[in-house]
């Protein structure tokens, strides 16, 4: 199907075509496609999400109604959270009997997932900026009793200044006080244990906003390690790992990170929802507080002299440490190249350029798992899986 052939006919979507000129495809979902578009009066660029509520004619009347209601619910939630600096802004909407057109700000930097693919792993500094913004978004959503239910790097966009914008509220839901959910939805490797338990136990009480915090932990781990905390080629075994909270800080990347960042990740990946960190608790964690600089500093000659002495002492130690560094021999490189950080990054970068995909570096570290998520969040029934 050509690019133009995939577009809805202009006779049925006169309002959209009157104001916007659709361009190339930016992404696809199960029943939707995202295109760049130009606003004709201003010549500004936007992104339009075109949702075919009929599934190309393959959906039943009941499925069409469900998708229509889900889209209207997504639009309603987007309007409720409009104005937040880190949430994608819905600019315009158009509706016909068969299509919805949702016009958003265009994020030219693309997905956080693509940025991570390019960078392999992120530093603590980059991760701190991204996670603080994400947690502030989640905090705002949860105060409105809105649960996102599909948090993952693919649904986090970046603007030109590398600020994040949370998107894809298709599975979002605004809860009534005390309400619990039982639907199994989301992307398998980001599912919280209680969501999986709901599919296996008819008597399970359900789940709430805590599922977003679990997904946040998976995202943070993935940004730092470059691979997800829970992965197995057999999906059922991966789900068992999630339900038992079976993950490790065993890959070489974790040797470069502080205990503080590991502690925060472990506060998210707690199997019991009631013991899991909330967004507010996470923002108060030392990981986000240790680099906060006071606006006013009182001058202290004694303190300044102490800093100078410590700086000189540190410089001397670094110099002698540098002098004692052992040369990298051929035997060391052959025996364990991943133990050397510069070589590790070089190998990762060239492996991707040569093979076009990431290579497995160990049983507990598989970047290929990152690419197993479908473009749109997955709906599935665990009851149909065989052990």
From Swiss-Prot:
Q: What is its EC number?
A: 2.7.11.19, 2.7.11.1, 2.7.11.26
InterPro entries cross-referenced by the UniProt entry: Kinase-like_dom_sf (IPR011009), Phosph_kin_gamma (IPR002291), Prot_kinase_dom (IPR000719), Protein_kinase_ATP_BS (IPR017441), Ser/Thr_kinase_AS (IPR008271)
**Where is the Protein kinase domain positioned along the sequence?**
20-288
**Alphabetical UniProt keywords:** ATP-binding, Calmodulin-binding, Carbohydrate metabolism, Glycogen metabolism, Kinase, Muscle protein, Nucleotide-binding, Serine/threonine-protein kinase, Transferase
Keyword Coiled coil applies: no
Q: What does this protein do?
A: Catalytic subunit of the phosphorylase b kinase (PHK), which mediates the neural and hormonal regulation of glycogen breakdown (glycogenolysis) by phosphorylating and thereby activating glycogen phosphorylase. In vitro, phosphorylates PYGM, TNNI3, MAPT/TAU, GAP43 and NRGN/RC3.
Q: Per its record, how is this protein called by name?
A: Phosphorylase b kinase gamma catalytic chain, skeletal muscle/heart isoform
Designated gene of the protein = PHKG1
